[in-house]
Structures are given as structure tokens and as C-alpha cells.
Design a protein with these regions (language model features):
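Class I SAM-dependent methyltransferase SAM/SAH-binding core
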Residues: 2-35, 82
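Residue-level preference for short coil/turn positions at secondary-structure junctions
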Residues: 13, 37-40, 70, 171
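Conserved Rossmann-like nucleotide-binding pocket used by diverse enzymes
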Residues: 18, 45, 75
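S-adenosyl-L-methionine-dependent methyltransferase catalytic module, highlighting the catalytic core
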Residues: 21-22, 55-181
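Alpha-helical architecture
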Residues: 27, 49-50, 136
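A short acidic, Gly/Pro-enriched loop at the edge of an enzyme's catalytic core
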Residues: 31-45
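A short SAM/SAH-binding and catalytic strip from SAM-dependent methyltransferases
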Residues: 42-55
Length: 181
């Protein structure tokens, strides 16, 4: 999955590692990964990606599990908090587009029932700021969904590793690892 250059460069020097993208080659769409990716990997790094993936959260996690060989490792960072449930910014997201530019961007959504919704004050991440934040996970949901789709040995890591860019300025979004059961 797409991750920061600091991770990708180091991993490429050490392993047979490929950093993938949603918008350019090499492509990996975690919503529907190509057959060639299934059951192939010893480890997958997902660094601040899942909050941008549309569709049900559990689908992306199930597909992450499907990428891994049995016993394979998922290393995951994603914004989460210790609130009761995952916060979906656009719970009826169905057919959507972004209109406008800069601070004037608006998300236009057509719900499954055909109702048009318009949202402003959007939160964008990454690169040129074009990647829309769709949700903030609740840690309890994330942990439960990982287990539900077949991950075991789910661990929250609080140690810092500055050489890898793991610096905890906030306890929310600490790295998580899980093994494919």
C-alpha cells in the first residue's frame, strides 16, 4: 500500500518491496485488489491510507488480510481515537465527486436513495492535499474488525523509532501490527 518515502526507500533496500498507489503505477486498489496480489505477501505496510478508502471499513481490512500469506504481518498506521465508535464524516457516501479548488472545495454526494448532499469544510491529507479524510476510526472498532477478518496477535506499539519516522506526538494513531491467522 502507499506509504511515506522514508519507509519505502528503506524497505526497498532491505526487502523485495514495492510501494503501491491508488492513482498511479504500480496500482493497488485495496477496495478490490487484483488476483495477482492475493496471498502473495509476507508483510504489508499501510501507512495512513485507510481513512481515505471509501466503502465499509471492514472490506478494506478483509482485503488487507487477503493480500498476506498465512502468518504474514500487517503494519498499520491510521488516525484513530478511543471514542465509542468510528466517526464516518459522510455516512451515506455513494456516488460522489469533489467540486471547486483549494479551501472552496465541496463534496457532492448522491446517496443510494438519490438524495444530493453537499459538504464543505473538508479535511484533505497528503501531497497536494487532494486525499479526502472519510473517517476517524475508533480503536475498539479497528481491533474488533481486524480480528473479525482473520488477524491474530493484534498489538498496539507505543515505542518511538525516530529513524523510521515513528515519533508519537499524540497517543492517537500509534502503530498497530497484526498477523494473518
Amino acid at each position: 500500500m502507499s506509504d511515506a518515502d522514508v519507509y519505502a526507500a528503506a524497505l526497498e533496500r532491505t526487502f523485495n518491496y514495492t510501494n503501491t498507489f491508488f492513482h498511479m503505477q504500480p496500482v493497488l486498489d485495496i477496495r478490490a485488489p487484483a488476483q495477482q496480489h492475493l496471498g502473495r505477501y509476507d508483510f504489508v505496510v499501510s501507512s495512513d491510507v485507510l481513512e481515505h478508502v471509501d466503502g465499509p471499513c471492514v472490506n478494506a481490512l478483509r482485503n488487507l488480510r487477503a493480500l498476506l500469506k498465512p502468518g504474514g504481518l500487517l503494519a498499520l498506521t491510521v488516525p484513530y481515537g478511543f471514542h465509542d465508535t468510528t466517526i464516518e464524516h459522510f455516512p451515506e457516501l455513494h456516488e460522489y465527486r469533489i467540486e471547486g479548488e483549494g479551501a472552496n472545495r465541496v463534496l457532492v454526494n448522491i446517496t443510494q436513495s438519490g438524495v444530493e448532499q453537499r459538504f464543505s469544510d473538508l479535511c484533505f491529507h497528503g501531497g497536494d492535499g487532494s486525499t479526502l479524510e472519510l473517517r476517524i476510526y475508533a480503536y475498539a472498532d479497528l481491533e474488533r474488525w481486524l480480528a473479525d477478518v482473520g488477524f491474530v496477535d493484534i498489538k498496539l506499539h507505543s515505542n518511538e523509532h525516530p529513524q523510521w519516522g515513528i515519533i508519537h506526538q499524540d497517543p492517537l494513531g500509534l502503530p498497530i501490527t497484526a498477523r494473518a491467522g
